[in-house]
C-alpha cells in the first residue's frame, strides 16, 4: 500500500538545544512518506542554522523563516498553510516521537476510518530522562466532553485527515490555542479517537512552546 503524505507542523523559537533531537525523531520514523515544516519565529540563537544544516541533507525538511516574532499560533499557521500532506501532524521543537509513532497511528486511522486521533505519551525532563509519568489516551472525546471534562489531548500526538476534513488553522489566542483548535476540528468530525499506546515524549521545561499538559 502506498503511504499517504503526512505533513508535520513544527513551530520553533530559540530551541537550538533540543530541535536537532526532535527532527531526528522524525527522520527515524518507520513511516517514510512525510514532510517536516519547521516555522521559525525569528529565533536569535542557533536554531535556524541547525535546521538549515539538517534540511541540506534531507529534502523532506522545509524551513520557513520570518524577521518578526509573532508567536507560536502564527508560526503553526504558516506551516499549516504550506502543508501539502493528506494528513497533518504536530510536533513541538523540544518533543520526541517514538520510531513507530506515525506508522502505528496512520494504520489505526485507516483501519478504523478515523479522521482525528491522538495517542498516549510520556513525560521527560530537560535532560531527556524519563519522569515515570504517562498520560493515557481515552478511547474517544467529543466537543461536549472537552468543554466540561477538560482536554486530554497532547499536541505532540495529534494527527488529522486534511484530505477529508480540510485544513484547520490555530486560533491566535494567548492561552490554550491547541485546545481551541481541537474544538474547531470537532465541529466537522464530531469526535476524536485515542490510541492508548505511548508513542511520544513530552519535554517538561521552562519556556516550552506547547501550552498543553503543563499542569498534569
What are these model-derived regions, one by one?
Residues 100-131:
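Conserved donor NDP-sugar-binding/catalytic core segment of glycosyltransferases
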Residues 1-27:
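N-proximal low-complexity "stem/linker" segments adjacent to membrane-targeting elements
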Residues 3-6, 27-38, 46, 59-62:
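Short loop->beta transition adjacent to catalytic acidic/histidine clusters or analogous donor-positioning motifs
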Residues 88:
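Short aromatic/hydrophobic "clamp" motif used to bind/position activated sugar donors
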Residues 25, 32, 40-49, 68, ...:
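A conserved acidic beta->alpha catalytic loop
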Residues 17-20, 45-54, 96, 100:
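Acidic helix N-cap motif at the loop->helix transition within catalytic regions
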Residues 81, 133, 137-216:
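Conserved nucleotide-sugar donor-binding catalytic segment
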Residues 66-83, 104:
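Glycine-rich, basic loop-to-helix element that forms the pyrophosphate-binding segment
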Amino acid at each position: 500500500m502506498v503511504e499517504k503524505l503526512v505533513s508535520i507542523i513544527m513551530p520553533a523559537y530559540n530551541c537550538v538545544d533540543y530541535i536537532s533531537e526532535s527532527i531526528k525523531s522524525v527522520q527515524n520514523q518507520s513511516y517514510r512518506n512525510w514532510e517536516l515544516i519547521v516555522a521559525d519565529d525569528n529565533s536569535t540563537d542557533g536554531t535556524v542554522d541547525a535546521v538549515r544544516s539538517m534540511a541540506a541533507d534531507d529534502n523532506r525538511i522545509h524551513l520557513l523563516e520570518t524577521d518578526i516574532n509573532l508567536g507560536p499560533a502564527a508560526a503553526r499557521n504558516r506551516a499549516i498553510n504550506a502543508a501539502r500532506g493528506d494528513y497533518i501532524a504536530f510536533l513541538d521543537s523540544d518533543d520526541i516521537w517514538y520510531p513507530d509513532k506515525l506508522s502505528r497511528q496512520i494504520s489505526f486511522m485507516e483501519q478504523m476510518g478515523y479522521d482525528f486521533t491522538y495517542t498516549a505519551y510520556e513525560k521527560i525532563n530537560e535532560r531527556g530522562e524519563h519522569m515515570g509519568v504517562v498520560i493515557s489516551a481515552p478511547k474517544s472525546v467529543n466537543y461536549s466532553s472537552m468543554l466540561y471534562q477538560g482536554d486530554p489531548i497532547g499536541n505532540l500526538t495529534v494527527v488529522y485527515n486534511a484530505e477529508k476534513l480540510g485544513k484547520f488553522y490555530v486560533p491566535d489566542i494567548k492561552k490554550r490555542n491547541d485546545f481551541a483548535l481541537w474544538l474547531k476540528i470537532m465541529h466537522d468530525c464530531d469526535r476524536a479517537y485515542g490510541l492508548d499506546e505511548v508513542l511520544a515524549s513530552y519535554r517538561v521545561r521552562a519556556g516550552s512552546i506547547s501550552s498543553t499538559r503543563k499542569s498534569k
